[in-house]
Amino acid sequence: MSQDNEYGAGQIQVLEGLEAVRKRPAMYIGSTDSRGLHHLVYEVVDNSIDEALAGHCDAIEVALHEDGSVSVTDNGRGIPVDTHEQYDRPALEVIMTVLHAGGKFDNKSYQVSGGLHGVGVSVVNALSSELEVEVKRDGAVWTHRFEVGEPQVEEFERVRDLEPGEDTGTTIRFWPDDGIFETTEFDFKTLENRLRELAFLNSGVEISLSDERTDESSTFLFEGGIREFVEYLNETKTALHDDVIYYDDESEGIEVEIAMQATDELQGSIHAFANNINTREGGTHLTGFKTALTRVVNDYANTHDMLDDLDGDNLRGEDVREGLTAVISIKHPDPQFEGQTKTKLGNSEVRGIVESVTHQQLGTFFEENPDTATAIISKAVEAARARKAAKQAEELTRRKSALESTSLPGKLADCQSRDPAESELFIVEGDSAGGSAKQGRDRKFQAILPLKGKILNVEKHRLDRILENDEIRALITAIGGGVGDEFDIEKARYQRLILMTDADVDGAHIRTLLLTLLYRHMRPLIEAGYVYAAQPPLYRVRYRGNTYDAMDEAERDRIIEEECNGNPTQVQRFKGLGEMNPDQLWDTTMNPENRVLKRITVEDAAAADRMFNILMGDAVGPRKQFIKDHANDAEWVDI
């Protein structure tokens, strides 16, 4: 797209070597599971996004190939190919083989750059069995090839001249090393969600994704940027005002962009980004926004006598944010990330800048749009009334201490251990299964809480109504960390919550209701990795005195073929946990030596918010459309 040559070998700064990457990949990409695998793609795409932020690229193509490789193509300036003085090698080779070698560390080339770990394509190269690069710049097409991170001798070559009018740019194609990654199969949906998010955050950049394996493809281009992001998140919700509120500003080299829209939902949905990185743990930009938002709303409400119903109280932040969908995006030349997963923005100066911008621009917006201000404040006042009503009920559910066993629910069969790190709570569907679980468990560290029937769908109710539900109250009390904004994970009595429901449609529904409760009102449990779904076997196969358990039909068929010579004595399908006796339940589902647990994680909070709203919210239309779109993907249906 651009012929600007300020980006050359001289701008490539080298910080350290690559030796340790293959030995300790998790240090560089977070993990070697599916999340780490997809992070390789994000690292390469981030380089293209940096070119876009610098104004040199407006199209990025990601392709999943049938041979298991991925290619990322952009129309930026192309990676420099001239000789690097320090190394006496092409800059392209240095970038691909030396950790932290790149123009990101030279502010002349990139004022702002993304990349959570910021490790660059050299790490992608180190963790790939093979990598190929094609660069179009300096009037020619250049190629290079690497194997296990090593440049191949005489593989760097000038292939041909650029055609007149042909775009500059870079294509990187890599094959992840299956000796390092637990899986090398890329998931289209995971990449699609992240690339859609990047397109929203970088208006005017077209990002496409294609999958040769399935012929699926998606293209994203959002001229409206984060305005359109908020509209997308609110597609399934009823907005309280027509237009998305949007403002942006720049101060001290830091760009601030904020979009928001209030809805009649009970759950808020605020997503904060720094240099395109989803800061799931929040940070100074989010704190600044929340502080200013609450102050602006209260200032306007008090000036216009709108808080008379609250007995002299002001609105709290949680009241103002109820049903609010917002996206905060900042671009910082030197972001500092902290927190457990390095997804919390730590730059102290950002808070004041975001606060000031929001106070000034949102305050002005309210004065110029009184109808919108009134709609937002009326909703917040309603939320404050409900909060006060919920306060009394909430007190009943809060545990005095994480280690006390007084006033626990009568139906809870608690464990002997008082150490949350070794304690686990099985949340079991039905009294009959609960009885088997209580008898089959290891009392030292396993607690059992049977739930009767289906709990309330919390997506449709405020906290005061939720806390009237006996089963939910028992669950909150048993967990011990409180609920809602005041939930304290340090007070949780168990560090493993295991949802154990039947392997049928009703069981799946109960599990979904429980996950909705945990996601909306005790989300830190999911974010900390404390929540699991038990995976009880679906089938038991007997043959000549031997017993085999199968998790699904494919495993059942394999056992019948390989272990039973195609002629089993008996095949039993477990319809419910209650059909298993205590010993069977222990052996198959509860014994840490044998069991299979599925950890519940949230990769993408915006996508999760939207999905919970579609599946569990009030609007029927989006749910109906979702079912139509995905009916063919259903693995089993009870009719």
Curated annotation (Swiss-Prot):
EC class name: isomerase
GO molecular function: ATP binding; DNA binding; DNA topoisomerase type II (double strand cut, ATP-hydrolyzing) activity; metal ion binding
Xref: CDD domains: HATPase_GyrB-like, TopoII_Trans_DNA_gyrase, TOPRIM_TopoIIA_GyrB
Domain annotation Toprim: ranges: 423-537
Subcellular location per the Swiss-Prot or TrEMBL entry: Cytoplasm
Cofactor: Mg(2+); Mn(2+); Ca(2+)
Region described as Disordered: spans on this chain: 392-416
A single BP term in Gene Ontology: DNA topological change
Co-factor binding comment: Binds two Mg(2+) per subunit. The magnesium ions form salt bridges with both the protein and the DNA. Can also accept other divalent metal cations, such as Mn(2+) or Ca(2+).
UniProt cross-references to Pfam families, sorted A to Z: DNA_gyraseB, DNA_gyraseB_C, HATPase_c, Toprim
Cross-link (Glycyl lysine isopeptide (Lys-Gly) (interchain with G-Cter in SAMP2)): K624
Keywords: ATP-binding, Cytoplasm, DNA-binding, Isomerase, Isopeptide bond, Magnesium, Metal-binding, Nucleotide-binding, Topoisomerase, Ubl conjugation
EC numbers, comma separated: 5.6.2.2
InterPro entries (UniProt xref): DNA_gyrase_B_C (IPR002288), GyrB (IPR011557), HATPase_C_sf (IPR036890), Ribosomal_Su5_D2-typ_SF (IPR020568), Ribsml_uS5_D2-typ_fold_subgr (IPR014721), Topo_IIA (IPR001241), Topo_IIA-like_dom_sf (IPR013760), Topo_IIA_B (IPR000565)
Site (described: Interaction with DNA): K454, N457
Known catalytic reactions: ATP-dependent breakage, passage and rejoining of double-stranded DNA
NCBIfam families reported for this sequence: gyrB, PRK05644.1, PRK14939.1
Protein family per UniProt: Belongs to the type II topoisomerase GyrB family.
Function: A type II topoisomerase that negatively supercoils closed circular double-stranded (ds) DNA in an ATP-dependent manner to modulate DNA topology and maintain chromosomes in an underwound state. Negative supercoiling favors strand separation, and DNA replication, transcription, recombination and repair, all of which involve strand separation. Also able to catalyze the interconversion of other topological isomers of dsDNA rings, including catenanes and knotted rings. Type II topoisomerases break and join 2 DNA strands simultaneously in an ATP-dependent manner.
HAMAP family: GyrB (MF_01898)
Further information: Few gyrases are as efficient as E.coli at forming negative supercoils. Not all organisms have 2 type II topoisomerases; in organisms with a single type II topoisomerase this enzyme also has to decatenate newly replicated chromosomes.
Protein name: DNA gyrase subunit B
Organism, scientific name: Haloferax volcanii (strain ATCC 29605 / DSM 3757 / JCM 8879 / NBRC 14742 / NCIMB 2012 / VKM B-1768 / DS2)
